[in-house]
Amino acid sequence: MVVGWSLLGWALSWLAVATVVVSAIVTVDKEALTRECDPDTPMVVPNFKANWFKATEYCHYLDRNLVIVTSAEKQEVITKVLEGTDKFGDNSFWVGGSDLAELGNFHWHSTGTRIVWHNWSELVPMPTADDPTRKDDRCVLLSNNTEMGGFKWIVVNCWDEYYFVCEKGVFAK
């Protein structure tokens, strides 16, 4: 009986220590969560990386869509939003464009409209049907580096994980 109680005491002590350690490691940015859930915030950058599909799903969960970029002015607004986050140093963010329905025919997922205005990087070539190494590169990423001269668009594998930008939209609930 004594062994049982001392073993239980030891286990409870370790559980208490583990709880304190985990509590110290896991910090919650309450301000970011508030912004993310605030229906009046026009754009949010969730606090985790995801593949393009999961990012789309999460934005819908927030009654938003992956951001669409329809002009240089809109891209500048997005850039300013990103500069105001702690994610800016990551340099790459999912937006709502892809050519998943037809190779080379890019559309905005949330509206179904063809991408007219664009800001493709000249440094990263577009994938082609005859390049088997890039067959999964179908989703648009807003990527920033000095060689590209600021945020430019590139097409990458939709299953790669990046931060992403959600926005309130006409088609969001």
Curated annotation (Swiss-Prot):
Supply the Pfam families for this chain. Answer: Lectin_C (PF00059)
Q: Where is the C-type lectin domain?
A: 51-167
* Tagged with keyword Signal: yes
Glycosylated residues, chain numbering: 119, 144
Q: Would you tell me the protein name for this molecule?
A: C-type lectin mosGCTL-7
Function noted in UniProt = Carbohydrate-binding protein.
Query: Which source organism does the UniProt entry give?
Result: Culex quinquefasciatus (Southern house mosquito)
Q: What happens when the gene is disrupted?
A: (Microbial infection) RNAi-mediated knockdown results in reduced Japanese encephalitis virus infection levels.
